[in-house]
Amino acid sequence: MSEKKEIKNKINCISNTKKITKAMEMVSIAKMKKSEIKMKSRKPYLDIIKTIISHILYNHIKYRHLYLNNRKTKKIGIIVISTDRGLCGSLNISLFKKIIQLINIYKNKNVMSSLFILGSKGVSYFKSSTYDITYYEKIITKNYTFFDCLNFIHSSLEYYNTQKIDKLFLSYNQFKNTLVYIPVIMQLLPLSKKIFKGNKNSHWDYIYESNSGILLDTLLNDYIESQIYQSILENCTCEQASRMISMKQATDNSEDLIKKLRILYNKARQDNITQELTEIISGANAVSLY
């Protein structure tokens, strides 16, 4: 009887867990769709800025900006886009391992690294080791807007602008589809003029008033800020997709476990019935002997 009760309690406990994981799966689906729409809606804006910069640079070949100038690398900075919450599979760990590889590559060249981390998971991971965390922030709002992340972006860029670091990398999870997301590390600064090539031959009839150099300064800043924010949106979409899959797997595993426990419960129940029948028959036989 105690075995049946124990199995029944396990079934009830797992059923309650299954309800939670199923609810979290549905919430993640809704959040992922919302985040994906936001991510895709920002992409054309980034492409347009890139196109405008391409045309201006094409007409100002000798123009040099702080973000276009290469300098001797003494120290690098890495912007780490992580999550505030867990239960999203190996999303963070895969990215962190790639970041550590980059740090070690530059360490072998006697180049130190500074980390600018967004998300509490990244902070807790790198704080447990001896890595230099220069600046960090948590994602404090559910709907993380462009203006919410400006303080983090400006704090990171300030170190490059004041030449405290000579290269700035951006690390995040790139969203491909619901099942595929890739940990990516890209060099954010200095920018290569190669990334702005490809659009210069298209039709263009804008007139810049008055100084295109001033406009280019503004656009380059806007491009960098938008690039970082785009990576934040992609990482958020990856987070929800990964959590959705993790919760679906947990729900499916719960269902499988419940099925196995029900088989055990029915078997224990049948054993009890068989034992009771055996006892009744044995008792009846004993009475008939008298």
From Swiss-Prot:
PROSITE patterns, A to Z: ATPASE_GAMMA
GO biological process: one example: proton motive force-driven plasma membrane ATP synthesis
Pfam families per the UniProt record, alphabetical: ATP-synt
Function text: Produces ATP from ADP in the presence of a proton gradient across the membrane. The gamma chain is believed to be important in regulating ATPase activity and the flow of protons through the CF(0) complex.
Similarity annotation: Belongs to the ATPase gamma chain family.
UniProt-listed HAMAP family: ATP_synth_gamma_bact
Protein name (Swiss-Prot/TrEMBL): ATP synthase gamma chain
Organism: Buchnera aphidicola subsp. Schlechtendalia chinensis
Lineage, uppermost ranks: Bacteria, Pseudomonadati, Pseudomonadota, Gammaproteobacteria, Enterobacterales
